[in-house]
């Protein structure tokens, strides 16, 4: 912001970008929250000449081009996945410093760690959890580390630590990202940096191999494809008066929509009515299609799961997953490497057909088959959890709830956010009348960002390095 001011750029808040953030939980590229500032998009370069506007050119255009499995070739295709992933991990292990690995209770990070230990028998793995029961992958991660023979280190985060770290975390983010998982990631990166300088992690596997449960939605909605558009529209209208949470309401509503209308990533938590209540400048013309229409235009004719994956590469992955991974690790001077996002791995994953990614009972089908010889059985078919965060419970009692009320009361962002409406939402959540945790978190992170970078009423205390420093 200081540089923007020196350059004379317009740093007023961009209301449209704020609305996009509230819907998506991140600010989509190339937008920023400042009207006069834009970002160079991932996969692009800019040519700047005197007295000319910047010329932006995209050099990377990922495509999903499914190639069906010929009879008798299934195992060969699974072996191809294994081989290319083994090669990627080997390349990412090359370093003049010690390399470790993040290890949750899921298949992706476990696969990376299991392959990495072949190159470093002294591999250290790291995981994090919370004091609250039910919000920890620690036991599964410990069992996985033991199964592959890795030394394992765990960091358990208390509610007090969680709250105290928030200003520093948002300061390092530079922009609001409303993913609660970035907090445990910050702590495990800090712990890992005491022992290693580089870590491998499992980001990207879900987007490449079809790992999100929502990717199964085209199967559950397949019957709607046989109905005339007018009938689907009638069913959609019929769903509107049904009470929220009523069985079948969401199915009827989503089945009445096209893929482009209903799917814009993993993050939606606000309805339009809730957005109107929270955003004084809510504009119904500012929709997710501002972000997604051009991306969907590139994938016409692909199967629906491939189109969803492609959209997530350009939105969720680059706007949330990789931002939080990169910034939380670099905040602790730790280099993060992501073997699943190697171009050769993508080349293999992008050729998988629909039925090798999603079935009615599982996700990442081909990847699971390919990893059967590598990943311990207790992890192979385990449901996806990631780093679960207990914000729903902590926003109902304790230090995080107190911090939330204080953040709302002290905020000077009333021209951008309807603070009394947010206070009512927090009251409803606290009393158990509704689960507003993700909506509250989205707004609270923005308010904290605003307090740090615009109001300057919050000055984060930046921690000293948590690793030996040679003077």
Annotate each language-model stretch with its function:
Residues 2-3, 107-108, 131-133, 160, ...:
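Short, solvent-exposed loop/turn segments at secondary-structure junctions
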């Amino acid at each position: 912001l200081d540089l923007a001011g020196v350059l004379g750029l317009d740093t007023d808040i961009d209301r449209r970008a704020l609305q996009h953030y509230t819907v998506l939980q991140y600010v989509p590229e190339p937008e920023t929250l400042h009207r006069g500032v834009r970002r160079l998009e991932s996969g692009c370069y800019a040519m700047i000449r005197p007295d000319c506007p910047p010329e932006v050119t995209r050099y990377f255009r990922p495509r999903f081009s499914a190639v069906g499995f010929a009879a008798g070739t299934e195992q060969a295709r699974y072996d191809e996945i294994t081989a290319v992933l083994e090669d990627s991990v080997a390349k990412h292990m090359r370093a003049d410093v010690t390399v470790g690995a993040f290890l949750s209770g899921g298949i992706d990070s476990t696969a990376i760690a299991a392959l990495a230990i072949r190159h470093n028998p002294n591999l250290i793995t790291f995981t994090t959890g919370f004091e609250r029961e039910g919000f920890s992958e620690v036991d599964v991660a410990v069992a996985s580390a033991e199964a592959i023979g890795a030394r394992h280190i765990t960091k358990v985060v208390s509610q007090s630590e969680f709250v105290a770290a928030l200003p520093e975390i948002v300061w390092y983010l530079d922009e609001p990202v409303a993913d609660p998982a970035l907090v445990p990631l910050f702590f495990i990166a800090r712990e890992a940096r005491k022992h290693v300088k580089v870590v491998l992690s499992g980001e990207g596997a879900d987007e490449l191999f079809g790992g999100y449960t929502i990717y199964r939605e085209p199967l559950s909605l397949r019957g709607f494809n046989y109905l005339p558009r007018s009938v689907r529209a009638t069913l959609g209208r019929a769903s509107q008066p049904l009470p929220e949470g009523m069985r079948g309401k969401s199915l009827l509503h989503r089945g009445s929509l096209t893929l482009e209308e209903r799917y814009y990533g993993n993050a939606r938590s606000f309805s339009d009515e809730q957005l109107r209540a929270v955003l004084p400048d809510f504009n119904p013309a500012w929709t997710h299609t501002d972000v997604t229409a051009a991306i969907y235009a590139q994938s016409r004719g692909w199967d629906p799961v491939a189109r969803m994956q492609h959209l997530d590469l350009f939105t969720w992955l680059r706007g949330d997953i990789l931002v939080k991974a990169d910034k939380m690790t670099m905040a602790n001077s730790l280099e993060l490497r992501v073997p699943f996002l190697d171009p050769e791995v993508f080349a293999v994953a992008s050729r998988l057909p629909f039925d090798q990614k999603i079935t009615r009972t599982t996700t990442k089908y081909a990847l699971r088959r390919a990893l059967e010889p590598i990943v311990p059985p207790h992890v192979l078919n385990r449901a996806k959890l990631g780093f679960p965060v207990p914000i729903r419970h902590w926003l109902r009692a304790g230090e995080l709830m107190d911090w939330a009320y204080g953040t709302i009361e002290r905020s000077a962002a009333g021209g951008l956010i309807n603070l009394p409406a947010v206070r009512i939402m927090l009251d409803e959540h606290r009393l158990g009348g509704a689960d507003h945790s993700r909506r509250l978190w989205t707004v609270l992170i923005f308010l904290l960002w605003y307090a740090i970078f615009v109001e300057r009423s919050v000055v984060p205390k930046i921690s000293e390095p948590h690793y030996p420093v040679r003077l």
